[in-house]
């Protein structure tokens, strides 16, 4: 449970739940708020097309049954190497800079197991570097849509051997 500061009207209690426990409508409303209605045109959507989110690594934070923060993780691959695509990490616009996104990132990372493959994401290295993500090791990778190479980030804490080149895409 997360406890937000009490307001004059009511105390707000937020709780973390697996993403599978959040309605599609509530999640879509959050994603539209955080990224816009045209979010489906982004390259990250091509990477996870047809995939099902990884349940033990995908969460949301509910505030009075409204999803205000979510993180999703997806199975992807570069050549024959399995990876976990992290994202989207969505925070409602009225909750930006609240620390909830950071808390959910830590929760997701804590939920990883030694058997989980390395993680990749498209994001700001200045922000996600604090979680161990960097563009090191992704310079020879391509994506099925536009992207900025400096924003293709890898977290390979187990130092798994990964291909130097290849196209990132959905796991089969």
Identify the residue ranges that each predicted region occupies:
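Accessory recognition modules or surfaces
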Residues: 98, 147-158
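Short, solvent-exposed loop/turn elements at beta->coil junctions and helix N-caps
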Residues: 44-50, 139-142
